[in-house]
């Protein structure tokens, strides 16, 4: 009845997530309201590697105009770099979801901003379930906003 899940905190999340991210074969969907240069320095090389393997990457975030000061410029620059790699970037006003769906088989969801986390107490749950991943894709209506390859 229940899918097996694994819990991570701010200290254990990225090791597991980056391993799974590198093993993704078809598609990566990330929803994260904030994007910072510091986090992107870690993730951009992985995104680049995955794009060279023709892995589809879709990121849903806030429009940079919703950020103030330095966060505006960090988001704007990161989005430019992501788009240069061929990453599809979507904007949702007031966005605050924090999740990732890998190959429509693995879900990560919780409180951690995947593209910006720096220094706070967080929780993320990994669910390895094709059924849960497809249900979440339907719930966030990703196929309506980002066409499949």
Task: Give residue ranges: language-model regions.
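Cysteine/selenocysteine-centered motifs that mediate thiol-based redox chemistry or coordinate metal-sulfur cofactors
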Residues: 134-149
């Amino acid at each position: 009845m229940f899918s097996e899940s694994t819990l991570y905190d701010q200290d254990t999340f990225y090791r597991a997530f980056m391993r799974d991210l590198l093993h993704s074969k078809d598609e990566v969907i990330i929803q994260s309201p904030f994007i910072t240069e510091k986090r992107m320095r870690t993730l951009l090389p992985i995104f680049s590697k995955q794009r060279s393997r023709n892995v589809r990457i879709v990121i849903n975030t806030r429009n940079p105009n919703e950020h103030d000061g330095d966060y505006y410029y960090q988001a704007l620059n990161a989005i430019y770099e992501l788009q240069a790699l061929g990453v599809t970037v979507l904007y949702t006003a007031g966005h605050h979801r924090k999740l990732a769906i890998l190959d429509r088989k693995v879900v990560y969801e919780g409180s951690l901003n995947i593209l910006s986390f720096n220094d706070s107490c967080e929780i993320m749950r990994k669910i390895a379930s094709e059924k849960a991943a497809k249900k979440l894709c339907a719930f966030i209506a990703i196929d309506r906003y980002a066409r499949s390859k």
